[in-house]
């Protein structure tokens, strides 16, 4: 049996609410079903599709009771709690860059962009509240709009 696709990525965060706002208000994900784990968190979905398991899992770190999370997912160094660590970035295919640009501007989210003609892509890079770089790949024609 081979690997067929990326199921989700998880972000440990000390500010669950800031991460929720970023992924729902800027990235346009939706909070959906999450099992009743014994630690704070949210599962985020595209387009209301809950047929799978969410694409982003936000894992809240409770500074008053970190043991619940450690028991479930294991210990992590506080040094690795921001940025992407050894992962450079995560990327999504996307459409409607003008609408996303409006959301970024409205929420004061900085972005870097470039068009890569040989790939037919307009790439936009944004940083989430935990310092994770997210790449959004739009059709190249959207880069001029």
Model-derived regions, located:
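N-terminal beta-strand motif that seeds the catalytic metal site of vicinal oxygen chelate
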Residues: 1-20, 87-90, 140-145
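Vicinal oxygen chelate
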Residues: 2, 92, 98-145
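Exposed loop/turn and edge beta-strand positions of beta-sandwich/beta-sheet ligand-binding modules
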Residues: 5, 38-40, 86, 120
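Conserved catalytic-core motifs of GNAT/GCN5-like acyltransferases
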Residues: 10, 30-37, 114-117, 141-144
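Short hydrophobic/aromatic beta-strand micro-patches
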Residues: 10-12, 45, 91-93, 127
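Core segments of cupin and vicinal oxygen chelate
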Residues: 12-61
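Active-site/binding-pocket entry motifs
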Residues: 50, 64-65, 142
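Short, flexible, mixed-charge acidic loops at enzyme active sites
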Residues: 66-77
């Amino acid at each position: 049996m081979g690997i067929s696709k990326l199921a989700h990525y998880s972000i440990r965060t000390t500010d669950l609410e800031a991460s929720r706002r970023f992924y729902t208000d800027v990235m346009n994900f939706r909070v959906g079903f999450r099992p009743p784990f014994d630690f704070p968190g949210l599962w985020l979905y595209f387009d209301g599709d809950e047929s799978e398991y969410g694409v982003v899992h936000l894992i809240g770190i409770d500074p008053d009771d970190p043991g619940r999370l450690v028991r479930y997912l294991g210990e992590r160094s506080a040094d690795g709690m921001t940025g992407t660590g050894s992962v450079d970035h995560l990327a999504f295919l996307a459409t409607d860059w003008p609408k996303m640009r409006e959301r970024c501007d409205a929420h004061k989210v900085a972005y870097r962009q470039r068009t890569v003609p040989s790939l037919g892509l307009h790439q936009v890079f944004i940083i989430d509240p935990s310092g994770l770089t997210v790449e959004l790949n739009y059709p190249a024609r959207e880069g001029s709009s």
